[in-house]
From Swiss-Prot:
Residues 74-255 are annotated as: N-terminal cyclin fold. GO terms for biological process: nucleolar large rRNA transcription by RNA polymerase I; RNA polymerase I preinitiation complex assembly. Residues 40-68 are annotated as: B-reader. Although it shares weak sequence similarity with GTF2B/TFIIB, displays a similar subdomain organization as GTF2B/TFIIB, with a N-terminal zinc finger, a connecting region (composed of B-reader and B-linker regions), followed by 2 cyclin folds. The RRN7-type zinc finger plays an essential postrecruitment role in Pol I transcription at a step preceding synthesis of the first 40 nucleotides. Its main location: nucleus. Belongs to the RRN7/TAF1B family. It comes from Gallus gallus. This is TATA box-binding protein-associated factor RNA polymerase I subunit B. GO terms for cellular component: RNA polymerase I core factor complex; RNA polymerase transcription factor SL1 complex. Keywords: DNA-binding, Metal-binding, Nucleus, Transcription, Transcription regulation, Zinc, Zinc-finger. It is found in: Nucleus, Nucleolus.
Length: 582
């Protein structure tokens, strides 16, 4: 830019007190002496279209920083945007599609800001606006509105609101007084907590995971919600103390910690329900179809969970038959359609686990009696089948012992890790430069004392976080101890009938005769461990450990599948007796 354009601006620089201004290509005033870039509104008189019409532009500039060392002025939604950015980058590092952050999650977030009246919206006349630029990142948040397009519905037109090309945020409550942010480091922290206390879809840390899962589901990524939450707990995805990665000038204290500090494990049901509500709130269209070659299809997920549960590969044929029989593999059933209240939303991982449980009930009954008889029968068959043609017969009793031993060890390890988890931030929080060195010295002293006491007590130092894996349990067919059951045969519990292999077991017990009203009870079925056989509870416990959810969630899905499978028998209308005419 020409020096003459900046010549009319004679204010002294706040940093060096010099009057030596220039203009960048973006129209921002900067000090040539100390290179400080400031916010500046300049009026340009244009006579090309309308005579004497004035056009105002607000340059991005540097954030206003208080004379004290309190840091930048920032809004709560900026903090959540940074968290989402960190989570998206972590997911990309785990192998998720690179388009997730820029082309999907970014647009979901923009849509949410517009729908919640936090940005990209018309502002009331006379409202004082403090434009705050978004932190520079590789998310292309500062790109022109024409460049972000997930679908046509996500492109925000000019009629939809005043779209700020610099993605500046402004509080929807208007001018935020200095007294508003006394109890928080952010500008609108106290206002956010007070205003959003009764709002159903207010932004929260669990909702960041709902955003991530919604983006994963849109892209049909091979990652279930249970996988996502497990990666969060293992530390591969920022969630606990995510605010420690905020820029140093974004000070957090008071109510900010109440918003961004997490001291509880993410709950599957909460994250999933918020995702469904969020998709409807954003008016998203029908998600991409879940077809039979998609990872989230029950046929594919059943194969994964059969391997992880150390069950025979032949069970996959039975799970596929059950999926086809109950029509739960249909595209319309599996695909999420936001806002459609007539269709039940699918939890893909829970559905696949429930399918396996129903198949085990069909074959082994799981009544604490019949499965052991079948196991003894298979053991006799293995003695007679010494050559091992077609693989050894599957013995439920042997499988139970192997899995129970492994499950008890892994469950104990998980419980200990959760009990020892320190809900503290690795990066100490300080709100004054004067106190920074004092706090750092105190933290270093505490850590040194912990190391010394640990050595004296002989406690084992916690191992680093495990490498990310889609499998919690792995079983090798090359093991010589016979602990892998993948190649075992089901012939010991099957019989040939009319040229087809059918189960020897012809009985079945239902978990419930009638499903509850979900709107009234909150659940379709209820589960109490003492009301069901121990074998059934053991299988539920196994899959609840693999998915990190409550056994009641899988039990509820089992009840739904059973009612689909035995629908005709359960709701068969009695025939009316014909009265004989005289």
């Amino acid at each position: 830019m020409d020096e003459e354009d900046a010549g009319d601006f004679n204010e002294r620089c706040a940093q060096c007190s010099e009057v030596n201004w220039g203009l960048t290509d973006g129209g921002r005033f900067y000090c040539r002496t100390c290179h400080n870039v400031i916010e500046r509104t300049r009026e340009v008189v244009s006579t090309d279209v309308i005579p004497n019409a004035r056009v105002q532009t607000i340059s991005k500039g540097s954030r206003s920083q208080k004379k004290t060392d309190e840091g930048w002025e920032w809004y709560v939604c900026e903090g959540f945007q940074l968290v989402l950015k960190q989570q998206a980058e972590a997911l990309e590092a785990l192998g998720v599609c690179p388009q997730m952050k820029d082309e999907v999650l970014c647009n979901f977030w923009r849509r949410y800001l517009q729908k919640s009246q936090q940005a990209y919206c018309n502002r009331p006349a006379g409202e004082t606006i403090k434009a705050l630029s978004v932190c520079d990142s590789s998310t292309d948040m500062d790109s022109e509105p024409e460049q972000h397009s997930l679908l046509h519905f996500l492109s925000v037109s000019e009629s939809d609101g005043d779209l700020q090309t610099d993605c500046s945020y402004a509080s929807s409550a208007g001018k935020v007084s200095e007294s508003t942010s006394v109890c928080s480091g952010s500008v609108d922290g106290s206002l956010y907590v007070r205003k959003n206390r009764k709002e159903k879809l207010r932004m929260s840390m669990p909702m960041t995971l709902s955003f991530c899962y919604m983006a994963l589901l849109w892209l049909k990524e091979p990652m279930t919600l249970s996988d996502l939450l497990r990666f969060v707990v293992e530390g591969h995805i920022p969630y606990f103390n995510a605010y420690q990665h905020f820029p140093e000038k974004m000070k957090l204290y008071g109510l900010d910690l109440r918003i961004f500090c997490v001291e509880s494990w993410p709950v599957y049901e909460e994250v999933y329900n918020k995702m469904v509500e969020l998709a409807a709130f954003l008016d998203l269209p029908r998600f991409p179809d879940i077809t039979d070659n998609c990872f989230l299809h029950p046929d594919v997920l059943c194969m994964k969970y059969l391997m992880e549960a150390n069950l025979p590969d032949e069970l996959h044929n039975w799970t596929c038959r059950l999926v086809k029989k109950t029509s739960i593999g249909e595209v319309d059933f599996l695909t999420l359609t936001p806002g459609n209240k007539s269709t039940r939303k699918v939890k893909y991982d829970v559905l696949a686990a429930a399918v396996i449980v129903v198949v085990l009930k069909l074959l082994f009954l799981l009544d604490d009696h019949y499965e052991w008889l079948l196991s003894d029968f298979s053991a006799e068959g293995n003695k007679n089948n010494k050559e091992g043609e077609g693989g050894p017969y599957f013995e439920f009793k042997k499988w139970y012992r192997v899995i129970k031993c492994t499950l008890d060890v892994e469950q104990k390890k998980l419980d200990e890790e959760k009990a020892k988890y320190l809900w503290k931030c690795e990066k100490p929080l300080f709100y004054s430069v004067k106190k920074k060195s004092k706090i750092l010295r105190r933290r270093q002293m505490v850590e040194n004392l912990q190391i010394q006491f640990g050595k004296l007590s002989g406690s084992v130092q916690p191992a680093g976080r495990p490498n990310p894996s889609s499998f919690l349990l792995s079983w090798s067919e090359e093991s010589t101890d016979g602990s892998c059951f993948h190649g075992h045969s089901l012939k010991g519990i099957l019989q040939e009938k009319h040229g087809l292999l059918t189960a020897i077991n012809t009985d079945y017990w239902l978990c419930t005769d009638k499903l509850c009203n979900e709107k009234l009870c909150g659940h379709l079925a209820h589960y109490r461990e003492e009301d069901f056989p121990k074998s059934y509870h053991f299988v539920l416990r196994l899959f609840s450990f693999l998915l990190r959810i409550q056994p009641s969630s899988i039990h509820e899905e089992v009840c739904v599948i059973e009612h689909k499978l035995f629908n005709k028998k359960l709701y068969k209308k009695p025939k009316r007796k014909r009265s004989l005419r005289k």
